[in-house]
Every structure is written in C-alpha cells, then in structure tokens.
Amino acid sequence: MLRKIGSFVLTCLLAALPASAQKVGVVMSGGGAKGLYHIGVLEALEENGVPIDYVAGTSMGSIIAAMYAAGYSPAEMRAIVNSGVVREWVSGRIDPNRYMAYYRQLGSNPGFLSMRIDVESPAGKRLRAPRNLISSTQIDMALTELFAPATAAADGDFDRLMIPFLCVASDMNHRGPVVMRRGDLSEAVRSSMSIPLVFKPMKVDSMLLYDGGIYDNFPWKPLDRDFRPDVIVGSICTEGNTPPSEQSNIMDQAFMLAMHDTDYTLPEGRSVTIRRAVDVNMLDFDQAEAIMDAGYEDAMAAMPQLLEKVGERRDSAYYAGRREAFRAKCPPLIFNDYKLEGLKRTQREYIRDFVQVDRRTP
C-alpha cells in the first residue's frame, strides 16, 4: 500500500515539473511605427509576472526585442519613444546639440528627390540616383548608443544578452531570410529594419541585407527552432498578407509589394496571439502613445488565456534584479577606434586634423 502511495506521489511531482519549468518565447512582427504596439504588450506581460525567456523580431519588432534583450525595461522604452527621439531617427536629421561638431549635413532642400551627375564615371557624365530617401546617419548613431554596451557585455553572442535574442534580415544577393544571432547587435537590428527605398541596405560579409519583413515579417519559426520554448507569445501589429490600399502612402505601397507572404499562424495548444491591425502609416510616429496603449490593452485582454498556459510567475523584483546584473557587465560607450574609407590621403589627414586625431593612428 505504501509503495502504491509513494508511486502516486512521485507521479504527481513529475507531472508538475514541466509546468514549473516552462520557457516562454515572445516574437514581434515588423510594421514600422505600428511596432510600438509591442512595448505595450511587454508592459502587460511583465506586470502580470509572465516569464520572458527568449525574444525575436523583425524590423521594428527587432528594435523592441533587442532593447528588451539588452536590459531596457518597457517603461524605459516608452519614455524613449515619448521623448521624440524616434522621430529624429526616422527623419534622418542629426541633433545639432549632440553630433554637429563631428557630422556635417547639407542644408534643407525643398525637393522630394535629389540626383547628382557623376562627371568622373568612365562611361561619361551620367545621373546617379540615390539609394535611399532618408539618411541613415541618425539611426546608425542611435542604435550604436543603445546597443554597443550590450554587445560588449555579451561578447557578440546574442544568447548571452539579458534575454537570448534573434532577428531576421533579408539577403538580397541570395534571395532569402537570414537569422542573426551573433555579431554587432546594432548592426543586426539595423539590417533587420533597412526598409527598401527608405534606408540604405547593410553589407555584412557577402550579404546585402534589407528589412527582414521582405521574407519573414513574423519570425516565430526561427524562434521555435533555435530556442524551443514551451509557450510562444506572438505580438502582431499588422493586418498580415494583404495588398496595399489606395490610402497607403508610396513607401508603404512599395514595401508591401516587395514582401513575400508570411506565416502568422502559431502552433495550437502552446501559443497565444496578441494582434491588432494598427491603422497608421509605416513612418507615422505621431500616435506613438495610442499605439503603445493599444498593445497593453490587447495583451491584458489575452492575459487569462496566457496565464493558463504559464506555470511560473515572476515578480517585478526578479526583472529589476536581472536588469541590474546585466547592466553591471555593460561597459560605457567610448569611441576609441575608427576607420576612414573611400578617401584620398590628403582628405584623410584633413579629417584627422578636423577632429584632432593623432596622425600616428592608422
């Protein structure tokens, strides 16, 4: 009799183990300004003690996921968005109070599109069309500031961030998606959000990388394959595989025409989808607060269903302690190395003199 009771108790204990050891992965779709929706979703998840063990994203989803993985809290993300700096990132304008001493831009031009004549071309004088409509200087600097310390702390391994992270970019040379899990975090995110026509692509090794949304706007399959979470939470801010409408602006239309269909259907039984077709244009950040609030509201509505699937709960002290421990490993951002490319010797020396760099530096 005692043996039967002991076997029954052991069986109950073993049955309870998977529930207490469940791992949760959160995947975030692309969508430009719509992607601010994910910040509200993360707020609700933390507020309700939902464990977040892995994060993944595409385009704007990759930015939000990477910020979370690098130790930024949802409240800090909301504050950054509300400060207005995100509008500066996507405008391409440099803040004169921060960077103008070292970065010089041309004056404002009322023209929508500027083209220059290449008089040194072997083929003779010809027009050279721009590769992008918005300068990437501002967002390149912003992403470096956001992610360089975390890259150093993780030694370039995204599994060693505060939360393991991956994102997806599109390799246009080999015509397919690329899952990014190592390297420079700012470079990976910048690759994932290089919207065609808007920002210039990133060149990494032999790959020419554009926005990950072209091939996979909702990378739940890479997250599931690489991290194997028990529960997947999907945050989707777009309508899905729909053709552009007459109301869409020209950049939205061009991007949607380039996109391949994405699988937005998560596996049944171990997933919860939080979704809204946020009705703003890709670069419209004027409604940021409302977009973030929408994500929070939708996540709260889905919370009863999600909590049924999650055995473990984590309080605010857990998240605060984990962030503090990771930030303690992050070194301060210091620019102590540089490379000048595409310049003649006299031009390189002029730049060094201008920024007062030691001539002995290569």
PLM feature segments, named:
Residues 1-5:
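Positively charged n-region of N-terminal signal peptides that target proteins for export
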